[in-house]
C-alpha cells in the first residue's frame, strides 16, 4: 500500500499522529470515533466487526459507531507524502466516502416511485444511476444498498410491464446495471427463474442494441442460473428460445470488451452445466466460437471456464464431431496441457480423451501435435489425480498412433514411472 510500510523500510520516520493506533501503519482514510480518537477506517471497521464495543486506545465504551472522516488530518498526511516523494513515499489517494443510509433510502424511494406528473422516468433512472455509482465504490456500499430492499425494488422495476417496456429504456438499463452489482439470494433467483415471462424478457435483452444492456443481461442470467438450486428452474432458463445465441454473440463479437468476454464465458459455462440443453449450445455454434476465443484473448480464469465448457460439450457425440471439425481444437488442447494451470490441464485432457475416443483422426492429430510427450510429463507432475488418470487413459488410446521413432520406443519412456498398459 502506498505510504504504508515502505517509508519505514527507507528509514523515514512517520509522524506519530499519522499512524493508526491499531495497525501502526500510515493512515490512508483517517476517521474519528465517539471518544475523539482517530483511526484508519479499515482498522476500526475490522475492530467493530469483531464485536468490540470499546475504543481500542481509551477502552471507553462507544456511545455510537458513527465514523466521522477527519479531512484535516488526511490532508496533512497527503502533504507529508508529497514532501517525502523524493524518498519513495507515494501520496495517499483521497478516499471515497461510504454511502449515507438516509441518502440511500431517499434514492430508492425516488427510484420506486410511480411515474407520473411529479416523478419522471428520467428522474427515477437518475436516482438508480447515483445508487450504481455508490455500489461501484465499495462492497460496504453494496451491502448497505441491498439491505434497504434494493434487489426487490430493482426486480420490480426491471420486469414491470414486460410486454410494453422498450428494451432501450433508460430505466431498464440503469436498474439492470445496478441489480447485477448486488448479490441475489437463492429465493430471489428462483423467483425470477420460475417466471417464464421474466426469463423470456432477460433473453430478449441479450439482443438489445445497447452492448451494455446485453452484457448486463448475460450477467443477470448467469447470476440467476448460479443462484437457483432447482434443476427444473435451471432448465427453464437454459431452454429459453435463442438464449445460447444471445450469450455466444458476446463472445464472437470482434469489438467485445474484456468485461463482455468475461461475463459471456461465465454465462455460457453456467448454461452448459445444464446437461439436458447442451445440444442447444452446439447447434448455436458454441464449439467454433469457444475455440476461436481460446486461441486468442482469454485470461487464465476465463481460459479455465472455456476449457471446462469444451469438456462438457465433448460429452455429446455431436459436440465431439463439431470440435473435431475445427482445425485448431486438437493442437490447442495439446498446447494447453501444463501451460496454463492445473485446472486448465485437467479440462484439456478431458476434452482430448473424449475427442480421441470418438475419432481416430483426432488421435492422429494429437500424436502429431506432440501429445505423447505432454502426457508423459503430466503423469509425473504434481497435477491433480484426475488429470493424471485422464492422461493415462489417453496414453492407452494413443499407443497405436505412435510412429516407430516416437517417445514410446525411447529410453526415457522405458525409465518413466508411467504404469504399464
Swiss-Prot record:
Start and end residues of each U-box domain: 13-87
Pfam families, per this entry? U-box
**GO molecular function, one example?**
ubiquitin protein ligase activity
> Biological process GO annotation list?
defense response to other organism; protein ubiquitination
Listed under catalytic activity are: S-ubiquitinyl-[E2 ubiquitin-conjugating enzyme]-L-cysteine + [acceptor protein]-L-lysine = [E2 ubiquitin-conjugating enzyme]-L-cysteine + N(6)-ubiquitinyl-[acceptor protein]-L-lysine
Top-level division of the source organism's lineage: Eukaryota
Q: Gene3D superfamilies given for it?
A: Leucine-rich Repeat Variant (1.25.10.10), Zinc/RING finger domain, C3HC4 (zinc finger) (3.30.40.10)
What does the UniProt keyword field contain?
Answer: Transferase, Ubl conjugation pathway
Family matches, as SUPFAM superfamilies = ARM repeat (SSF48371), RING/U-box (SSF57850)
Q: Which InterPro entries match?
A: ARM-like, ARM-type_fold, PUB22/23/24-like, RING-Ubox_PUB, Ubox_domain, Znf_RING/FYVE/PHD
The pathway that the record names for this protein is:
Protein modification; protein ubiquitination
* Keyword Nucleotidyltransferase applies: no
Enzyme Commission number, as recorded: 2.3.2.27
Keyword S-adenosyl-L-methionine applies: no
Main role? Functions as an E3 ubiquitin ligase.
Name of this chain's protein: U-box domain-containing protein 26
What organism does the record attribute this protein to? Answer: Arabidopsis thaliana (Mouse-ear cress)
Q: Per UniProt, what is the name of the gene that codes for the protein in this document?
A: PUB26
Amino acid at each position: 500500500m502506498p505510504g504504508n510500510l515502505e517509508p519505514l523500510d527507507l528509514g523515514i520516520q512517520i509522524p506519530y499522529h499519522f499512524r493508526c493506533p491499531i495497525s501502526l501503519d500510515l493512515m490512508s482514510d483517517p476517521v474519528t470515533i465517539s471518544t475523539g480518537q482517530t483511526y484508519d477506517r479499515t482498522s476500526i471497521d475490522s475492530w467493530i466487526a469483531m464485536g468490540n464495543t470499546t475504543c481500542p486506545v481509551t477502552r471507553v465504551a462507544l456511545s455510537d459507531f458513527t465514523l466521522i472522516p477527519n479531512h484535516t488530518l488526511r490532508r496533512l498526511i497527503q502533504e507529508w507524502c508529497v514532501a517525502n516523494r523524493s524518498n519513495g513515499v507515494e501520496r495517499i489517494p483521497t478516499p471515497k466516502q461510504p454511502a449515507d443510509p438516509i441518502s440511500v433510502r431517499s434514492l430508492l424511494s425516488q427510484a420506486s416511485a410511480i411515474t407520473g406528473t411529479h416523478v419522471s422516468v428520467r428522474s427515477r433512472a437518475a436516482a438508480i444511476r447515483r445508487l450504481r455509482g455508490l455500489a461501484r465504490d465499495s462492497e460496504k456500499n453494496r451491502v448497505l444498498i441491498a439491505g434497504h430492499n434494493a434487489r426487490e425494488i430493482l426486480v420490480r422495476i426491471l420486469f414491470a410491464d414486460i410486454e410494453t417496456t422498450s428494451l432501450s429504456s433508460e430505466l431498464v438499463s440503469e436498474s439492470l446495471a445496478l441489480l447485477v452489482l448486488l448479490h441475489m439470494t437463492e429465493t430471489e433467483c428462483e423467483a425470477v427463474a420460475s417466471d417464464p415471462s421474466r426469463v423470456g424478457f432477460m433473453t430478449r435483452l441479450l439482443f438489445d442494441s445497447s452492448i451494455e444492456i446485453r452484457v448486463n443481461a448475460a450477467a443477470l442470467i448467469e447470476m440467476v442460473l448460479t443462484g437457483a438450486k432447482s434443476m427444473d428452474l435451471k432448465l427453464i432458463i437454459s431452454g429459453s428460445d435463442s438464449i445460447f445465441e444471445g450469450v455466444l454473440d458476446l463472445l464472437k463479437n470482434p469489438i467485445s470488451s474484456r468485461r463482455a468476454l468475461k461475463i459471456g464465458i461465465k454465462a455460457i459455462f453456467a448454461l452448459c452445466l445444464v446437461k439436458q440443453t447442451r445440444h442447444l449450445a452446439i447447434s448455436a455454434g458454441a464449439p467454433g466460437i469457444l475455440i476461436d476465443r481460446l486461441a486468442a484473448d482469454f485470461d487464465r480464469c476465463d481460459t479455465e471456464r472455456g476449457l471446462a465448457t469444451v469438456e462438457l460439450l465433448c460429452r455429446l457425440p455431436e459436440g465431439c464431431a463439431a470440435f473435431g471439425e475445427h482445425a485448431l481444437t486438437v493442437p490447442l488442447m495439446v498446447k494447453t496441457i501444463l501451460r496454463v494451470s492445473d485446472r486448465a490441464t485437467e479440462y484439456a485432457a478431458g476434452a482430448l480423451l473424449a475427442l480421441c475416443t470418438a475419432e481416430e483422426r483426432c488421435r492422429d492429430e494429437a500424436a502429431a501435435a506432440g501429445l505423447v510427450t505432454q502426457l508423459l510429463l503430466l503423469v509425473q507432475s504434481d497435477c491433480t489425480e484426475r488429470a493424471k488418470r485422464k492422461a493415462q487413459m489417453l496414453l492407452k488410446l494413443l499407443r497405436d498412433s505412435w510412429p516407430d521413432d516416437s517417445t514410446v520406443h525411447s529410453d526415457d519412456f522405458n525409465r518413466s514411472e508411467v504404469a504399464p498398459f
